[in-house]
Amino acid sequence: MTKKILLNAFLFIAILLASALMLLPAMLDKSMNPVSEHAPFVVSVEAQELHGSLIVGDWHADSALWNRDLKKAYDYGHADIPRLQAGNVALQMFTTVTKSPSGQNYDSNESGANDNITALAIVQRWPIKTWSSLFERAMYQANKIKDLEKRDPENFMLIESQYDLGIFLLKRVNNPKMVGGLIGTEGSHALDGNLENIERLYENSFRMMSLQHF
């Protein structure tokens, strides 16, 4: 009887933990990346026409850090393909987040401080190799963006060269809603202290590296 009670208790705890791991990533994402509700902005016809005539580019989005399908529209977070299209954003730089020290601030950060991304990677069930390697974290996030192009080629194109950019702009003439994406690093933590990783990142579609983040 005691064994049966213990087994049932173990199963209950296991189910509870599994449920928490399934729900926690989205809960964290929604709490840390809310979108403020507001009344519709008043935009003049002239401003709308001007905005619609521009090739708009945004150079920072941490969207690949989170467990989201960027093909879908969300009511939280920075960006996804439907919202980029709605805002007439033609080019989006997807930056890979690999390290964020506990207590991060604008004045002073300790290099030995606990890293927030490690816990987030574990909670979001990233591959084990990303738990200890900043380079692998960058690669994992970049692969999400490359996979997005494979799954949604009508709406998204990864740009890796000047030639790609030209092709993208031609495609956008017939499909004004197409979004072009680039991949970059947020800070150079992804090098993991090894300059040879610059070449490895380039070979894996990275085209921008910010030298410092904090």
Task: Describe each model-derived feature in a short phrase.
Residues 2-214:
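N-terminal hydrophobic targeting/anchoring segments and the immediately downstream early-domain regions
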